[in-house]
Amino acid sequence: MRKINFSAGPSTLPLEILEQAQKEFCDYQGKGYSIMEISHRTKVFEEVHFGAQEKAKKLYGLNDDYEVLFLQGGASLQFAMIPMNLALNGVCEYVNTGVWTKKAIKEAQILGVNVKIVVSSEESNFDHIPRVEFSDNADYAYICSNNTIYGTQYQNYPKTKAPLIVDASSDFFSRKVDFSNIALFYGGVQKNAGISGLSCIFIRKDMLERSKNKQIPSMLNYLTHAENQSLFNTPPTFAIYMFNLEMDWLLNQGGLDKVHEKNSQKATMLYKCIDLSDGFYKGHADKKDRSLMNVSFNIAKNKDLEPLFVKEAEEAGMIGLKGHRILGGIRASIYNALNLDQVKILCEFMKEFQGKYA
């Protein structure tokens, strides 16, 4: 029996995708070999590779103003690649909303970029998304769309004249996005759109001009990968194959509007369970900034019960509920592949647990 996986990433995958990958693992579409065994220069793999890029653009409704890059190194490598490629001689402005923005800020500072932290929610342990106004003439404005540890999420992105950079690793492909002022939109795909080992970057083509005439190693230059269609070196072929299956699955769900509708239903159910617990459970995030992806909460009446909650949940078939080591508590990551019935099972367990230990 499969466990219900609430892990923050790598995370649960749709069963039908796992079954299709299993079916094709040794014999891809009757060709007599695995997709993992063939060259990335073959027609067979190119169909997967370019098909995945086109489907990703279709889901977000993007035209040819954007390039889709498949890169390695995780989203963490982008913390350095972004300032390397996109910083000019001005100020690069960051909003600090958690661990991942702190890491991005640190990498930019290591590179000697003129970093300005325009606002931070660190004083309140990152429990909300601070309101912000960026400078019109900043080299770029940087935000993290969703914060996995603290359970906060931008409901709408800030409107900026400066190019907006968005780390969307933990809410990738979970909802439609207004790209009107987004210059670069990126994430690792292992939470909502595949397996670990692949990052997907949507970059507006005019931003690639910033990489020209810069002394950047070839592998770290966006232009290198754009000019070579993300085939400059051997890409993570199996991760791209899995990403392609995920794109098909998302399209078959009815696209990102339908996916967002389901995600909203799941989150509403879980937050209602927390809010109606008479203070037994308490969410970390400010209600107006609650994440649809990561629900971080505590057993407010007795935090010593939290390890027991995780243990008993696992015995009941639910894994991945232990909170991040920085924040502690309990965290349920309810990404695209989790369905409403699975979240309902968690809510029923929470009510039973409260009944036993309140």
Curated annotation (Swiss-Prot):
Major site of localization recorded for this protein: cytoplasm
Location within or outside the cell: Cytoplasm
GO biological-process terms attached to the record: L-serine biosynthetic process; pyridoxine biosynthetic process
Chain residues that bind L-glutamate: 41
Reactions that this protein is recorded to catalyse: O-phospho-L-serine + 2-oxoglutarate = 3-phosphooxypyruvate + L-glutamate; 4-(phosphooxy)-L-threonine + 2-oxoglutarate = (R)-3-hydroxy-2-oxo-4-phosphooxybutanoate + L-glutamate
Cofactor: pyridoxal 5'-phosphate
InterPro entries: Aminotrans_V_dom, Pser_aminoTfrase, PyrdxlP-dep_Trfase, PyrdxlP-dep_Trfase_major, PyrdxlP-dep_Trfase_small
Annotated residues for binding of pyridoxal 5'-phosphate: 75-76, 100, 148, 167, 190, 233-234
Matches recorded under SUPFAM superfamilies: PLP-dependent transferases
Entry keyword annotation includes Transferase: yes
EC numbers on record: 2.6.1.52
Oligomer status and interactors: Homodimer.
NCBIfam families on file: PRK05355.1, serC_1
Annotated protein name in UniProt: Phosphoserine aminotransferase
Organism: Campylobacter jejuni subsp. doylei (strain ATCC BAA-1458 / RM4099 / 269.97)
